[in-house]
Amino acid sequence: MFLLYGGLFFLLLSRFVFIQFTGTAEGQELSTKAENKYSREQILQANRGKIIDRNGEVIAEDTLSYKMIAVLSPSATNNSSLQRHVSDSAKTAKILSKYIDMTEQEIQNLLDKNIKAEKYQVEFGKAGRDISNQQMEEIKSNKLPGIIFIEDLKRLYPNGQFASHLIGFALKEEKEDGEAVAVGKMGLEYIYDEELTGSPGKVEFKSDTKGFLLPNAEKMVTEAQDGLDIYLTLDKTIQNFLEDAMNNAQEKYEPERMTAIVANPKTGEILAMSQRPTFEPNTREGLSTNWLNEVTEQTIEPGSTFKIFTLASAIEEGVWAPNATFNSGSYTIYDSTIRDHNVVGWGKISYLEGFQRSSNVSMAYLLNQIGEKTFNEYINLFGFGQKTGIDLPNEATGIIADSGPVERVTTTYGQGTTVTPIQMVQGMTAIANEGKMMQPYIIDKIVNPNTNEVEQNHKKIEKDSPISAETAQHVKEILASTITSEIGTAKKFKLNGYTSAGKTGTAQISKPGGGYYWGRNDFLYSFLGMAPVEDPQLIVYIMVHKPKLELTESGSDTTSDVFNTVMERSLKYLNIEPENLELANPIEMPDVIDGNMLESQSKLEALGLKTVVIGQSDKVEVQYPESSTTTISNSIVFIKGQGDIQLPNFKGWSKRNVMIYKSLSNVPIEIVGEGFVTEQSLTGGSIVTADTPIVVQLATPEEVTNIEAETEELATDLPQD
């Protein structure tokens, strides 16, 4: 027995000596094992980057929430009178099922399974995350032992239904280590997920056996790096104007779909975009199978809004003759007949009237004058059939129908050819921006919130200039006449306090198997417009797909409800001064061609118009605005004859009227600045010729206060020499 105990003692002593000298046991470094046992690491969560509007208003951000945990191990309870672990899984499950998205049985199974496995604690997955403070307090009021909460982050969209298909949403996903991280699932949240995702930090420290920080122990902190903040060109206020108008139209007309865009024509910035149906990003309520951003990813046949670009092509080519006439109603190509929307037409009418009435036949005749090849070149210059380059993925290009003569004609009025809404807006920037077409964009800048450094900064991109500034001005005025003319199709788009210009569209909707639907409620109604006419600040494009119309309603009711509301509210919000149009009386321009110059001048001034005479002959050869078009009292009108040209005093003139004078007189005038004329290089009254260079300086009303701005005529077209 002595030998047995002695042998055991010797073995233990040998083992002790071995461990002491080698520092290992069972092949493991004991110092490392001890280090690991008493080393603790806490993860510091990183905030996902914010999505912010142009004015610093938050669109998407991380906010404080709570994660619920059930402590299961009896070792957590040090005081038997105060339990700190789940002791009654059935009771706990019954109460918790009232607050989280799990059944009573699911909760009890989860608790019992992990109690049996001797787990210290367990989480409740998705159902136990994103707990609000109110929800947490309600659960706490039940005083359930072992149910604790830790702070967590939740993705919040404070504006709710707000450009939802553009912004998208992010959801928590569990990684392999059990940590839940927000991951972008749709929209900008998905597209810029890598930029928005931050890098978590950690705190490392030595602890006692209960996990508490040892006295005088140092903490090693690696700070979390928040994700990058993305600033958009969107304006929260204008976006809300659009959302409200879309909601009202949705409720009133019950269309299958709607899409709308608001843009700055001078920069290409998208200020608002929306579509219906839509969804609530915080709950995903309303999210259907359609995850497409229809502004960029959906193609449509644009209908008569495409006539804007046919008109611009004709004017730029010099073949637009507004007073020339054609027989409306029908146009035959081989064995196909093109008809006007009212089938019978309006007899022999002028091309200007044809455009105001939205005649398809007028477009067919214009194509003959432009030439098919030349027209296709203009379509390409306006950016159709190709991506705009907007900073969003999966952009569609559309298809230009030019397989045969019929298809080429129908393209002139937007049938058969497909485009995207963003292409229409991009093309319209050339009309509103003196011929310069701007690339649309949505991302303003990307900023690192950890360093405040701008990591990406978008600058406006001027693309092709498909037309001249003079042509753009001409188109703009004709578009204005579709609103002010008694025969115009866009009378319902007249704004309170502001002039507007644009074109209506009624497009047939193609069937999946070919052909088109035909019924009162089977059309795509649209409007592409801008305001104010003098210096457009905004472009608005609205499409309404298959609305339910009453017998007293038209397609223009659906689109004008949105356009007028959004445009008027947005212009006021942008501090664009109303034009006080209610004080101006509409006047139909008389025909003074071939009349005596002095008599014509007296006649026009008797109507309340300001007359500018170009040339000193006795006979009027050109007038602007043309006869039968509408202008307003106190507007500047022009009459031209032969002979010497006496330069007027331009002070207070608008840029538009200087451009009209330049076009009529052929005097080489260089226009510098925006707004109204403050200075001119040659004094009024001087005799000038086509070789006399003149510079006029303009300034905006904000830059100069001593100029009385002229009253602008509402709608005419530029003169033809």
Task: Give the location of each predicted region.
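Ligand-recognition elements built from short beta-strands and adjacent flexible loops
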Residues: 497, 501, 511, 542-721
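Acidic/histidine-enriched alpha-helical segments
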Residues: 108-115, 255-267, 328-329, 392-396, ...
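Conserved SxxK-family serine transpeptidase/carboxypeptidase catalytic domain
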Residues: 127-142, 151-165, 169, 448-560, ...
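Extracytoplasmic
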Residues: 44-47, 54, 61-65, 144, ...
